[in-house]
């Protein structure tokens, strides 16, 4: 067998062994020699065993030779031994046998060193040759005798194949080897022998010189620019390959990090070095990152080799795959999937399969992709037909996972059984279970365990069982729930069934349950002091087990110096996929990112880390923040943080850096704010790529979208898929029978899950427009224009007739109102489940109240909270009435708000808070749970002498801006500096603000009135009458707390956080993204910046002369207000003041006059866009135009005869132009200045 031959993995391994041998020990003879007889695939193993290769043999410094018999001694008169010269020919018939005596574990090689053969110079040369080979293997030394074994049967000396391949042994057998013998270069000096010398004692192989060889390779890699950390992580067998191909790969543009990643599959180094030019020519869009991701896989070299001849065909018809799609298949499906994709490409895209390229790629991009593609070809026609009736999308979802072929077969075998009694699953549930890795086993587990888990003592619902099984490892999770549920529900754990299900309903659910069982008691005790809810939140994600263990190990350190994180912050970081790694990233990066040149706040760092992939996002911010803040990018710190604070934040930052300059130039002409808005969502990287490839096409015929519309579609989770869906569906949806306008299509697509919502509208539109549903186009668009719109439409189709009939008797508008929110499907199901119970004793709610609670984001959870807490809150010590409870629950976040009132009301009514029940209810209704928590945390400090705020002012601040406002005041909002600058630079003659503005109590009353009103359309008119106010005065009051005119007229009060952001914008300050409130340093820096800016000459005149000067909007897409449900709870229980002192000075003399005036300015047909037609009474199917409003300083921008199309964002949602005007001149002297001064007076401490 030849050494150094380059064909085949076997001989490459031999040559790689020589790469580790330094020149003094490298054998001289490397010429090609003919292959010896019997040199087969096992010769490599024989050779390694012959030289002492043993996988698990420990390295030792020295070996003590065992006792052995003495060798014959040559007579003294014998002539001196000659140098290495060929001996007389040995017998030709040398069997190639690997004797056990040469194996690493044989002791016979030591104790019986073949005394039948006298030692010869050839044998000693053989020993030195074998010793050199042993050095090259980097393996522990094994004693080897200097004499070969003897075949007792033939009397011949035995040589194995490894010995036969040696040039020394070959020299002893010239008949057996064609090449002439060559003496090797000796690795050690030999002393001159005298005539009386005997042959030296038998030689044992010494320990390989691995330290010397390691130093040589290490030094070479260091010289090539690799860091010590990179070298430490490399595999030993890859070192020489890296050194060999480094120059070639770096010349092709690969970095040191790229080469290290490729070396995980060392064979890929050679393939990439040799074939990169051909790959780049065949796939010009294939990036080096794609190649690295493919090459580092288990068989990446084979995938690259398979890709090269078929790449051009895959980019052509019928698939027309992009380079990234081909790379995805090669990375995950490897060579078999690439070959199957090429072979089946026409069959998959033609009749009867008609798969799209995206579907084909999804199927092929998994382990077992080849088998899945073949199975789809066979099974898809069958599963689409009766009796299965699966859609193509469902079949693709099942096949697009590891084990997709087996999952398809399992669905075919079990679907009909699971749809029937006693299981009664629906098709979607079966598909959900099967659409994960291990789907076959999960289906079998559901079939085996569902009936047991639905019965006593488990009492799980079908939905809960399906949720547990619908993840990777679903079978094991079901088994764990069955084994541990009863124990976890009992003492000392005391978990609820819902909490156990939440923990188990993720990848690795079984391990997460075991971790909760092991660590819950410790984490609830000292010194951790976590609540049960916090432990459950940490465990309820992929990798929950590891996250719990990391919290237990690091919580105490992170709460102490120098990190100083709160327990809530640590929990927030850990409560995501990859929470363990995110905590490690915080420990490594927090101190660095808080110092120069980064200057991030702790809250910003926590916000970045509190997402899936948080560790990588932190590292990316550390690497790129400084560059992105500098020219030519010129991003602000807040924008960088906003981009990084999402799933895939690292990739989004890299995409912004790569594409920002291009997207700001022609032909895209996007603003920096628009690019940031697109990137600041989950999947921002893909969304930016989609905008770059589709913007120009979508702006042209036949789509004719505006740039703002394209940005609006892309600025959500799944923006890439939504853009693709608009490109595919827009033309069809604008035509008959759908007849949607472009704005309606954009509204549907501009939500999370927009792609699926568009597809659902196209599929369900004809059915829902016809009897018995008879929904209008506007109602369908309203349902679909929310996250989860597809599921909401399907739920309406499934539950509509039941909810319209007794005992529910809901109107069509009420059903649509419930479905037209986040989680509309779940809200409809909750109404069906809880309606009769809530209408009966002891609850006694009206139908309108049940609908009002369900008609908000999170309606299901709010209904469940009312079911659990209403009896408790009506009893002592709470003593709330039903109307107050319904008012709190009838808003987004109703469940946590109710729970916060239940937990904190007794505390907040006592010292040192001294709040009334009405104030607590108002804060919970207006600003929610977080505001109550902020008051509990900060009010004792705000009541002290350093702030001296009364309870009424604290309550007003909480209603104005929620938690953010309370924390900003607590940290030191620079109100005095702002007011002083305003007095110096923009003096206004007139009465002081205290004589013009309402009291804090009156402000809270007005906001609560709007939030608790049953008919938002009528709220403004009723407020004019209730508070005896003029229209301009009420508008100015609402404007002073961040409500735009159009929102006020529609009765839509945005949530406190959004209003606070607007108010800070009017003051000229934008808090850092991701932070709960501005930090003291940033606030003081803001005040100093204001003083420097306004201290310049001419600023006062500029302010006075241009009170309405607009500044550019921050983004083309205004933040959408939280849309109010049309069915809100009843009036507040506390008596409202008949009139307010500040309004009394401006009130009309006759209440009827007020009614007439308001009727003219706010007509009965004022609609809130998609929400208008959902009011239970007095609603039309189609909205009409808004009549001309009174002309007044506060309403001039509210033009006449403005028609709002159905299915668009609410007219209660201000446009970017509205917000720009609202925040136009922070320090002007316009009509709102008095009320801005009044706001500053309330905030001043």
Curated annotation (Swiss-Prot):
Keywords: DNA-binding, Host nucleus, Repeat, Secreted, Transcription, Transcription regulation
Core repeat repeat windows: 355-389, 390-424, 425-459, 460-494, 495-529, 530-564, 565-599, 600-634, 635-669, 670-704, 705-739, 740-774, 775-809, 810-844, 845-879, 880-914
Top-level lineage group: Bacteria
Induction: Regulated by hrpB, which controls the type III secretion system.
Nuclear localization signal 4 (motif): residue ranges: 1145-1148
Region (Activation domain): 1237-1245
Residues in Cryptic repeat - repeats: 286-320
InterPro entries referenced in this protein's UniProt entry, alphabetically: TAL_effector_rpt
Biased segments, Pro residues type: 67-87
Annotated disulfide bonds: none
Motif (Nuclear localization signal 3): 1108-1111
Annotated knockout phenotype: No alteration in pathogenicity on tomato (S.lycopersicum cv Supermarmande), another study found decreased pathogenicity on eggplant (S.melongena cv. Zebrina, PubMed:20687809).
Annotated Cryptic repeat repeat ranges: 321-354
Sequence motif Nuclear localization signal 1, residues: 185-191
Keyword DNA-binding: yes
Coarse class of the protein's main subcellular location: secreted
Disordered as annotated region, ranges: 1-87, 173-205, 1096-1138
Job description of the protein: Exported into plant cells, where it is targeted to the nucleus and probably acts as a transcription factor. Binds DNA in a sequence-specific manner. May contribute to plant pathogenicity.
Protein name: TAL effector protein Brg11
Gene source species: Ralstonia nicotianae (strain ATCC BAA-1114 / GMI1000)
